[in-house]
Each structure stands twice: as C-alpha cells, then as structure tokens.
Amino acid sequence: MKGAIVQRVVEYVTKEIVEDADSVSVTIVEDGPDEVTAEVRAAKPDMGRVIGRRGRVAKSIRTIAQAAADEEGLQARVEFID
C-alpha cells in the first residue's frame, strides 16, 4: 500500500503528542500515482496540541510526513480533521 511508511510515522508522532492516544487515527488517501494525503483524526481536546501555536506542531508533522514519503518516492500532504 502506498503511504504505509507515512501512515506509521504520522500516527506514531501524533500519538506521542496527544493525551488520548487511543482516539488517534491516520487514514491514507491516494490522490494520484505519486501523491498521498494523511488524514489525521484525534479527540477534540487534543487537536489544539496536534496543531500547536500558530500551527508550528502541524507544520513539523507535515515536514516529517514528507521526509517519510521521500522514502517511497511520494509527495505527502497532511490534513487535520476534527
């Protein structure tokens, strides 16, 4: 499955940030032949922690996701869904 590495990495990082790790789910959607989107869902109280002040944590997660996607030769996007 395309994006498996991205999914594992994003899920791991997100679970380390939130208080309710059981509420975290990451779904990979294939947008094209070389593009994937990681849809991140977490409990509402934890979304603030996942996004961070001025989106700094979210930006870091996106950077890490792209680094993981590079291993598979993909482009990655991360969407935070509440």
Model-predicted segments: where are they?
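RNA-contacting regions in translation and RNA-metabolism proteins
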Residues: 1-47, 59-82
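Glycine-centered tight-turn and secondary-structure capping sites
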Residues: 51-55
